[in-house]
Design a protein with these regions (language model features):
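Conserved active-site and cofactor/substrate-binding residues in soluble primary-metabolism enzymes
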Residues: 13, 126, 162-166, 216-223, ...
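C-terminal substrate-binding/catalytic lobe of Rossmann-fold NAD(P)-dependent oxidoreductases
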Residues: 27-68, 182-187, 191-318
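Glycine-rich phosphate/pyrophosphate-binding beta-alpha loops
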Residues: 241-243, 322-328
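N-terminal Rossmann-like NAD(P) cofactor-binding subdomain of oxidoreductases
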Residues: 1-207, 214, 308-311, 355-356
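Bilobed periplasmic-binding protein/Venus flytrap-like ligand-binding cleft at the lobe interface
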Residues: 157, 177, 269, 334-336
Length: 356
């Protein structure tokens, strides 16, 4: 029996990627797509690539058919999910939120960084965090709850936190990272990471042939990265916009303990990372001397990790590459839904990028 799926915010870039993945999923049936701006428009009129594939029509976000779904993905701006998730859960619908509304454990931290009131902080205690490779227990618990007939809420990790944390977590959890000093994260994303609404930074004439840092010292993904890695007030995160449609590269410079500096070799580090991610289909740890490329992961739910050990400076440099729209958004949400509904986490998800 197929899982009936709805997508709120389906006309945005992450929403459109969700449509692509859900329509190709053997266990999912897409029954509702919403967009307040495009309500009444056929999907194929907004995205012609779906011509002949689906005859769905966009409805408004308050469409009653959402409550008849088994799962609803919410790909909406921050604070918008809070307006719908409680009612959907009360109707027995499991929710997979791609926004930041339920990612942070502490509502006061959310309110400080997003300058908005959190209207359902009680859900932060029960939601699962959607980064399967690092929080498998959360999703296993959610799957158990769903099997018992309970609707669940999964807060899917953000794009920058996903690439950054996958690159850094094995070293952090191994105890190699020094207790003091900044952890520097320099990340670059394609323009789709900024969403579909155009602004002065993402306009073609501004973004083309240009690299630009933004949100320096104040980007909202900072507390999420710190929460995942357990590095409170230590992450110096600087995102950059690149003239790419999609793709994200995050380079993390981790200060090492004296013992790690003295004893580790690059081969040790690579072996540890490969063991850490053993059995995790979507994470590929590259051999020593190799570095990841966004072109190797775009269009897939895969992540590539490259490692370099700089003993002179006493740091480990870990770089992660993902597709910001797939592993950083829609693909990760589908991966989480697969786990919750008892399917193989790989079901319906692409793993190999076009080689050229």
């Amino acid at each position: 029996m197929s899982v009936k799926v709805g997508i709120v915010g389906a006309a945005g870039y992450a929403g459109a990627e969700l449509i692509r993945l859900v329509l190709g999923h053997p266990e999912f049936e897409l029954t509702a797509i919403t967009s307040n701006a495009d309500a009444g428009q056929p999907l194929s009129a907004v995205y012609p690539s779906f011509t002949g594939v689906s005859d769905l029509v966009f409805t408004t976000h308050d469409a009653p058919e959402l409550k008849n779904c088994d799962a609803v993905f919410l790909a909406v701006p921050h604070t918008a999910a809070m307006a719908q998730v409680p009612a959907l859960l009360a109707s027995g619908v499991s929710c997979f939120d791609l926004s930041a509304d339920y990612r942070l454990n502490d509502a006061s931290v959310f309110e400080a960084w997003y300058a908005a009131e959190h209207t359902s902080p009680e859900l932060l205690k029960t939601r699962a965090f959607g980064l399967p490779e690092l929080f498998c227990q959360d999703l296993e618990t959610a799957a158990s709850d769903h099997a018992d007939g309970k609707p669940v809420l999964v807060a899917c990790a953000g794009c920058y936190p996903t690439a950054t944390s996958l690159a850094a977590a094995p070293a952090v959890r191994a105890g190699w990272v020094a207790e003091n000093g900044p952890v520097v994260v320099d990340a670059i994303s394609g323009v789709t990471g900024a969403g579909k609404s155009c602004n002065a930074r993402t306009h073609f004439c501004s973004a083309d042939e240009n690299l630009e840092a933004y949100g320096v010292g104040k980007h909202r993904h900072t507390p999420e990265i710190e929460q995942i890695l357990g590095l409170t007030d230590r992450v110096v995160f600087t995102p950059h916009l690149a003239p790419l449609k999609r793709g994200l590269l995050s380079t993390v410079t981790l200060p090492l303990t004296p013992q790690a500096i003295d004893t580790l070799t690059l081969e040790d580090v690579v072996d540890h990372y490969k063991q850490f991610y053993a059995g995790r289909t979507f994470v590929r740890v590259l051999d020593a001397g190799q570095q990841p490329k966004t072109a190797s992961v775009v269009g897939t739910n895969a992540a590539q990790i490259g490692l370099a050990l700089n003993k002179r400076a006493g740091v480990l440099v870990a770089t992660g590459a993902i597709d910001n729209l797939c592993k950083g958004a829609a693909g990760q949400a589908v991966q989480c839904a697969n786990i919750v509904f008892g399917f193989d986490e790989r079901r319906g998800l692409p793993t190999v990028a076009c080689p050229v």
